[in-house]
């Protein structure tokens, strides 16, 4: 849930021009039977994670929706749906000129990779398609990321950023292709 909150903030708000100091979030949990102690424990851990994100980014969760009792009975006992967390967000764009897209804008522009990366392939499409079963799942450093987001926003509002794209599905190669194809 922490990484999901992070992705919403980074990919859907900050990258396109929202002020990182003026964002809000909404949560949606889809889970199995909360009367099952293990399932209730999963909910507690999810809530702890999004509370950490809300504190770190000073981004309140102002509303949400919870969908529980998503399970079914079988001869072998109940089966809960996998825990699913959806984070939606909104941000303040102080100047419409600061809203940018993800496609490459000008030839001979410099491309920068910002942020910190680790060997974290767990849960990725690459890991799934290449049989990597023991990869580390992505972690996030909220405090470091917030400082990065503020620096990025400063560059953006100074007119130094022409376009931006998150690196998620498919990594750097897919991101570069998406930026090139969409322009």
Give residue ranges: language-model regions.
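A general structural motif
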Residues: 5, 88-94, 139-149
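Generic beta-strand/beta-sheet core signal
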Residues: 16, 23-28, 60-64, 88-90, ...
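Gly-rich Lys/Arg/Thr-decorated short loops/hinges at beta-loop-alpha junctions or inter-strand turns
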Residues: 1, 84, 123-139, 156
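Acidic/histidine-enriched ion/cofactor-binding microenvironments in catalytic or ligand-binding pockets
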Residues: 75-84, 94-116
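Glycine-/charge-enriched secondary-structure boundary and capping motifs
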Residues: 39-53, 57, 62-85, 134, ...
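Short, small-residue-biased leader/transition segments that mark boundaries at the very start
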Residues: 2-8
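Catalytic palm subdomain of template-directed nucleic-acid polymerases
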Residues: 28-39
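Conserved phosphate/anionic-ligand binding catalytic regions in large, soluble enzymes, centered on
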Residues: 10-19, 103, 110-111, 162-179
């Amino acid at each position: 849930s922490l990484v999901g909150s992070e992705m919403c903030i980074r990919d859907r708000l900050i990258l396109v021009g929202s002020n990182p100091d003026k964002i809000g979030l909404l949560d949606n949990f889809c889970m199995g039977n909360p009367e099952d102690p293990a399932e209730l424990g999963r909910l507690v851990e999810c809530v702890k994670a999004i509370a950490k994100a809300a504190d770190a980014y000073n981004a309140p969760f102002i509303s949400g929706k919870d969908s529980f009792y998503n399970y079914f009975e079988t001869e072998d006992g109940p089966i809960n749906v996998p825990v699913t967390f959806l984070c939606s967000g909104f941000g303040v764009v102080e100047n419409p000129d600061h809203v940018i897209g993800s496609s490459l804008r000008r030839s001979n522009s410099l491309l920068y990779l910002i942020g910190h990366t680790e060997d974290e392939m767990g849960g990725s499409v690459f890991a799934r398609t290449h049989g990597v079963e023991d990869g580390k799942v992505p972690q996030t450093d909220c405090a470091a990321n917030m400082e990065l987001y503020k620096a990025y926003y400063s560059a953006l509002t100074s007119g130094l950023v022409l376009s931006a794209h998150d690196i998620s599905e498919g990594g750097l190669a897919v991101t570069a292709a998406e930026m090139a194809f969409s322009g």
